[in-house]
Amino acid sequence: MSFDVGKDKLYIQDVTLRDGMHAIRHMYGIDHVRAIARALDEAGVDAIEVAHGDGLNGASFNYGFGAHTDWEWLEAVADVLTRSVLTTLLVPGIGTVEELRRAHALGVRSVRVATHCTEADVSKQHIGIARDLGMDVSGFLMMSHMIEPEALAQQALLMESYGAQCVYVTDSGGALDMDGVRARFQAYDRVLRPETQRGMHAHHNLSLGVANSIVAAQQGAVRIDASLAGMGAGAGNAPLEVFVAAVDRKGWNHGCDVNALMDAAEDLVRPLQDRPVRVDRETLALGYAGVYSSFLRHAEKAAADYGLDAREILIELGHRKMVGGQEDMIVDVALDIKRRAEGKRAVAP
């Protein structure tokens, strides 16, 4: 355990301007990111993550193009921060060490190197170079529900051995419950050094984002991810203003202005949501099936294009154990479902 909720301060990491990109198809304007970053900075958030939803260099036909480049978003946020640490996310194979160096030159001082939960070995080069640049580095094990706690802990151990100063349980599918979160951090404790920090990245697809984050902190996770109004993929992340209000009632040290976060969520972020970020039929299907949360908007488009129920697509993606990076398979799955339905109609008496 690297954190004691009774005496230590939580490290609040906002992901509104990175994970939140998924919720609006990476369409934040420069004025939006400036205003949101300024509000977060003034509210006392420790770190603010900025990038395309799929991390540095994520803009592509597969993942979706953004309204601006990573560099334009990062420069805009760097201009307004006075205390919060400018952070970004990099997925090896999407982002390269060249993007990492460029982000550092723009003022990024902390990076999360993200891999699928069974592929920590591909993070070695990027973690090492980030450490050489003097950056704060976290390992980010996505879709952490897909493997058993002990196996996840061994992947975390690899990231620690490469130089990660913190390793996350990353519930990308919003499929973990409190018992699953607890078991994973207990497994981390059995193999990681006490000085290696733990972090929690929750999604709200089963309405457990805040509860899971509280349990994570009770199990020693000092770094907690959250976003204003839950702005994130699927049903969103743990809503920042809700999480902070909940832990404030418990007397925990979070360092944030609760009312300022409420105002930012309501006035700056919620009006941007062209699709409400909430638990509904489709986002609940994500958590129920254990599907990567950023598949939501892609699956909804495929459902509209081919006259299907988005839930059918999401459940099938779960059956096939599709993971982040396989967005191109969503249309294939939709076509398979459509062909099966047409075949059944053709043989019906």
Curated annotation (Swiss-Prot):
Residues reported in the UniProt entry to bind Mn(2+): D19, H201, H203
Record-linked Gene3D superfamilies: 1.10.8.60, Aldolase class I
Reactions the enzyme catalyzes: (S)-4-hydroxy-2-oxopentanoate = acetaldehyde + pyruvate
Annotated signal peptide: none
Record's keyword annotation contains RNA-binding: no
The protein's Enzyme Commission number: 4.1.3.39
Keyword terms of this UniProt record: Aromatic hydrocarbons catabolism, Lyase, Manganese, Metal-binding
Molecular function per GO: 2-isopropylmalate synthase activity; 4-hydroxy-2-oxovalerate aldolase activity; manganese ion binding
Binding site for substrate: R18, D19, S172, H201, Y292
Residue intervals of the Pyruvate carboxyltransferase domain: 10-262
Active site: H22 (proton acceptor)
CDD domains: DRE_TIM_HOA
GO biological process assignments: catabolic process; L-leucine biosynthetic process
Family: Belongs to the 4-hydroxy-2-oxovalerate aldolase family.
NCBIfam families for the chain: 4OH_2_O_val_ald, PRK08195.1
Protein name, per record: 4-hydroxy-2-oxovalerate aldolase 1
